Curated annotation (Swiss-Prot):
Protein's recorded name: DNA-directed RNA polymerase subunit omega
The species this protein was found in: Bifidobacterium adolescentis (strain ATCC 15703 / DSM 20083 / NCTC 11814 / E194a)
Stored Pfam families: RNA_pol_Rpb6
Molecular function GO labels: DNA binding; DNA-directed RNA polymerase activity
InterPro entries: DNA-dir_RNA_pol_omega (IPR003716), Pol_omega/Rpo6/RPB6 (IPR006110), RPB6/omega-like_sf (IPR036161)
PANTHER family on file: DNA-DIRECTED RNA POLYMERASE SUBUNIT OMEGA (PTHR34476:SF1)
Keyword Nucleotidyltransferase: yes
Gene3D superfamilies: 3.90.940.10
Role summary: Promotes RNA polymerase assembly. Latches the N- and C-terminal regions of the beta' subunit thereby facilitating its interaction with the beta and alpha subunits.
Keywords carried by this UniProt record: DNA-directed RNA polymerase, Nucleotidyltransferase, Transcription, Transferase
Catalytic activity: RNA(n) + a ribonucleoside 5'-triphosphate = RNA(n+1) + diphosphate
Family: Belongs to the RNA polymerase subunit omega family.
Amino acid sequence: MAFGTEPTPTGLADPPIDDLMEHADSKYALAIFAAKRARQINSYFTQLNEGLLQNVGPLVEYQNQEKPLSIAFREINSGLLEETLGEDDLTEGN
């Protein structure tokens, strides 16, 4: 394997987890945060095909066939989204 010939990793390896952790309190919170946003992005693409627009689309440029979770991680790393706890999050586990 020659160095410099491999493509730059994307998705879960890019952005690095250490960079993403600067935007969340824990890995668990980061996973929930990214999953919720990925679900919104996925719904946006589904609604786009149906002519409905109830969710906000990707806030960063994306490539065709890019996974919603990868897009969500890049949005979080870019500082375009801010994690806030909802009332359900505060009462969970009590």
